[in-house]
Each structure stands twice: as structure tokens, then as C-alpha cells.
Amino acid sequence: MNKITPLDVNWCNRPKSIAAALLQSENHAALIDPGPESTLTTLREQLRQHGLSVSDLNAILITHIHLDHAGATGKLIRENPNLKIYVHSKGAPHMADPSKLIASASRLWGDQLPTLFGETLPVPQENLQILEGGETLTLGQRKLEVAYTPGHASHHVSYFDSDEGVAFIGDTGGVRITDGPYILPATPPPDVDLTLWDKSFHTILERKPKSLFLTHFAEYNDPEAHIIEFRERLHRWFNTAEKSLAAATKFVGKTSPPIMQKPEPSATDPAAKEIEAKIETAAMAVFIRECSAELESKVGPAEAEHYAFTAGLDLSFRGLSRAIRKRQEINTR
């Protein structure tokens, strides 16, 4: 008996924001992406409704280590020390010692971090099962293929159940609220890479899944159409961010004092940092305005706010901006 069940963990009292995947087979139960620690009460209740407790789980599979996907893992280990935690090798060190992960999240979320994500605890090294991609996991009567799918994050993997035809792709497929008409890119810093992301799309589609399981939110049953639409929007958003940055750079350069207009200011120059912050702020405002208008036209204001809360348009701009600057640095070497 193999069964796949989406568990809505009701993030910040918002249904259809984060879905953990419960995988059951004979004498085995696993979760893919349990969510943040702040939603553990709901996760426990969801498990209870399916006749399970945390102590009944055998494994947790992490697509990537962002807190909305993996933040609860350390606390779950305290409740069930026998859990096996599957995670990519680039993410594993930050599961064992989440201090840098928490510091990075704090820079993005500030005082909201505890409310949004709760407490992120370390995972003991002995519980970690290190993945690279290419492995086949046996979970009871179920077998899952692991594939490395970077782009959204350098430590991102996807899990493929060929018998059921389901691909669990984390954030590689963006945000689509339960079969909705719009797919929202989620591109937070620090390591968005569209070249790698395109390769990950190919990795997913070449396996010909019947459906995609998105952490945000649940299943979608036309994988090829979803990926084609999402890829087009992802690249278009990249171009929108790039144009916004170029326009802001031109405008801020014209209105800045001469000291800020040095041809090649030092990266540590306070004046250079000030002008860069002005450019980012101006470009972000344009990006958010344009993307919000498109989103609202497709799903309406109320659902647009739900999408934006789940992915964060400001975070998406920051991730794209960082990717653009990286690409520019490579092209000028």
C-alpha cells in the first residue's frame, strides 16, 4: 500500500501556503519538506488525523534547506531521534549547524523571523543521509529517484516516484496555489541561477512525471505545460529586474552628488554602498509594481496578496538582482 497525502501546515494561519508530503507504504512513513518549526502543532495534528505521530515517522526528505521547507527538522529529531534526514551535501552542513542559515534569514526577515519560522535547531550529524543526486531511495515498498535540481538554490534536489508518476520538486516549479491560473517565481537570495534552473527543468521533464508536487502548493497534473509557462515567466521576471536596475542606475547616477559618480568606486566605499542601496530600492519598487499588476490581473487582489506573502516579491527581486550582478561580473572578466 503506497499512499501520497498533502498535509497543509497552515503557515501563519494561511491555508494553502505550505504543503508537506506524507508518503506511506507498508511499515514505513516519511515526510518530504516538513515545513518551518512554527507550524509543528498543525503538522502533528495532520499526522494524527492519518493515524500517525512523529514517533511513527521513519524519514524526512528535504528538497532544500530554506526554513519554510526544512526548519522543523531539528525539533522533529528531538521527538524522534531515529529519523533519517535526507538532504543534499551542500545543505547538510547547515542542517548540522544552522547558525549561518539563521543569520542569513535574519537579514531577510528581521524581527519577523521567530513568528514566521519558529526555532531552528541543529540536526545531529548521525541522522543526516547525504545526497548528491542519482541515488535511489527505498522507503518501505516505495522507491524514489533523487535528482540534483539547482537554480532556486544550490542545495536543491527533487524526488521522483516513477510508480506513482509524481515528482516532488520543492520550489523548482515556483508557487501555484492549488491548480490556480498563475505560477509565481520564488527567487530569494543568495544563489539563484537561471542557467542551472533551465537544466533542472530538463531533468524534471525527461523523467515524464504525471504530476508535480509543489511545496507551494500541492499537486498539478500537467507537468509539461506548467514548466513551459513557469520558465517563460521566470526569464521574463529576470529581464524585468535587469531593466529596472539599468533604469535605476541611470536615474540615480544623474541625481547623485559628484563624489558618488566615480567610474569605479571601491566596494567598501561608503558612498558606493549608498548609491548601490538607492539603486536597489528604486529598481525594486518598479519591479514589484509591474509584477504585482500582472499577478492581480490573473488572480485578483486577495489571492495576489496570498501569493506575494508565500513567495515574497521583495525577496524575489533581491535574488534576481544578485543573480544579475553575478552574471555581469562574469561577463566583464
Give the label of every model feature segment.
Residues 198-251, 267-277:
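Divalent-metal (often Zn2+) His-rich catalytic cores of metallo-beta-lactamase-fold enzymes
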Residues 30-32, 61, 85, 166-168, ...:
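Residue-level marker for buried hydrophobic side chains located in beta-strands
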Residues 70-80, 97-98:
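Metal-dependent catalytic neighborhoods of phosphoester/phosphodiester hydrolases
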Residues 1-50, 54-56, 159-171:
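Conserved beta-strand hairpin/beta-sheet module of binuclear metal-dependent hydrolase folds
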Residues 36, 56-68, 95-148, 154-224:
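Metallo-beta-lactamase
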Residues 243-333:
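C-terminal regulatory/interaction regions
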